[in-house]
Amino acid sequence: MNFHPYKEGYNTLPKLLKLSTPIFFYKINEEILKLKLESVKNQTVFAEKDMTEEIYEAICNFIVSQVPDLKPPYTFENLAMQLVEDLVIHRIKDGKNWTSAAHVCFPAGWYPEKVVGQSFFETHCEIPMNVANGDKLMKAAIVSGPFERFVWSVSTEKLWNRHPTVERKKFDPKNPSVYVIVERQIIYGFPKLECFLFALQQYFIAEDEIDKQALITALNNMTPEQMKYKSINKEYIDMLKTHWSL
């Protein structure tokens, strides 16, 4: 994966793109499996609310059809531990929408168990974005697609698990390191069951691969609300510019 979404600026709107590749999932490797097992040990990775066996069965069958050689039992939790991606299921019923199940080992600053049961608006209310059309967006996610969207962050380390309890390393001008963390979010709908699968897939862009001027431009063009949400300030941007001699 070589897509650099920061080149298009920073946007918190739910910009859905038609899926660009038939690949939904990647089978896990030993490095990521070890990190997932550490997450299982140290934090809550699975939660559910008002789920049905019918939905679990349909989604698990879909995953098995996409990835060869997965090992039984073909349960949601067991399959999630065999994939690079984290998995979330969102439902709509009787005019309501909510996150009904989540198996997330690598959350980006949030608690999976707190998101489960929340509506789209409740989950995203602190993000500077327009969620006025959240209900329409949820329906589109189910009946259209499949979709993908990309979100990105700047980090000082290659950190897969950014759970709120995990300590982060601050930028050190004397020993600098910079990564762009990209989260590819894949949305696949199941119209008959009124739900969609949300797969979260991370990859890292190393410092020597970053288009540094494009990244600085994207950071400078953030709104004050976006900068606050991403914990970015002008001082940090200036440190990056100095580090890269821009």
PLM feature spans:
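Extended, well-ordered protein cores
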Residues: 1-246
